[in-house]
């Protein structure tokens, strides 16, 4: 039969606008008065002004799990990563048949970064501040960006084994680099999610042009990583 693919917690337009404005950190736009809509639309105004509350009863009855149970959380996920108008977001998802413990252990071992990084970057791990990776560990690398030597230091945060961790650049070529790795059991395997928030140096001057080149490089790096994971047996 038919299934209503809608939110389990519907809201009215007024609340929708309020939550969206809050997430975007802007002032809410004043709603158009009902009388103005009736004058402009006539009888069609009833369609615009009337409320329809639809609930996803069938999928809820089948124990479907919603990623976001309310609109506020959904907006936070969409917009709260952005601290500056110069921040950029890159996201990638990939599924692998490997078990969660094996996948997490692989990605949380800094030595495997060399295998996951294109050779053109000449990426080398120089060491880390703790024997094992944990919250607060610093990892030191050297690499070449378009042939230019660079050094990079990452700080490990959000350390939740088998669930997630993030590496934050505290020294390197970007004004900001926050890479969050998420791991989730799915369909007998693991869904890998990468979320990268980055800010370019000199982003106020020619930022869009510079971002075109940098984003192309980021896509190349993650495409290479995707192909490596595809080859896992």
Which residues are covered by each model-predicted region?
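Hydrophobic ligand-binding cavity/cleft-lining segments
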Residues: 54, 58, 72, 76-130, ...
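Glycine-rich portal/gate segments that line the openings of hydrophobic small-molecule binding cavities
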Residues: 114, 124-173, 191, 224-232
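Short linear elements at protein peripheries
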Residues: 53-72, 142, 227-233
């Amino acid at each position: 039969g038919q299934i209503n693919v809608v939110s389990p917690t519907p809201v009215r337009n007024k609340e929708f606008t309020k939550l969206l404005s809050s997430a975007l950190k802007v002032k809410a736009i004043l709603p158009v008065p009902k009388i103005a809509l009736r004058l402009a639309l006539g009888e069609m105004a009833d369609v615009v002004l009337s409320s329809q509350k639809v609930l996803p009863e069938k999928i809820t009855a089948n124990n479907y799990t919603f990623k976001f149970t309310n609109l506020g959380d959904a907006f936070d996920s969409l917009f709260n990563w952005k601290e500056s108008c110069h921040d950029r977001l890159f996201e990638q998802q990939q599924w692998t048949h490997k078990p969660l413990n094996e996948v997490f252990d692989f990605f949380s071992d800094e030595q495997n970064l060399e295998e996951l990084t294109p050779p053109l970057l000449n990426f080398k791990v120089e060491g880390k501040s703790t024997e094992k990776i944990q919250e607060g560990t610093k990892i030191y690398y050297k690499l070449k960006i378009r042939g230019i030597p660079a050094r990079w230091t990452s700080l490990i945060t959000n350390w939740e084994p088998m669930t997630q961790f993030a590496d934050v650049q505290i020294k390197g070529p970007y004004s900001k680099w926050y890479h969050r790795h998420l791991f989730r059991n799915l369909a007998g395997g693991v869904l890998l999610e990468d979320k990268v928030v980055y800010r370019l140096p000199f982003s106020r001057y020619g930022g869009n042009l510079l971002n075109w080149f940098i984003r192309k490089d980021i896509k190349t790096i993650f495409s290479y990583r995707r192909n490596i994971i595809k080859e896992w047996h």
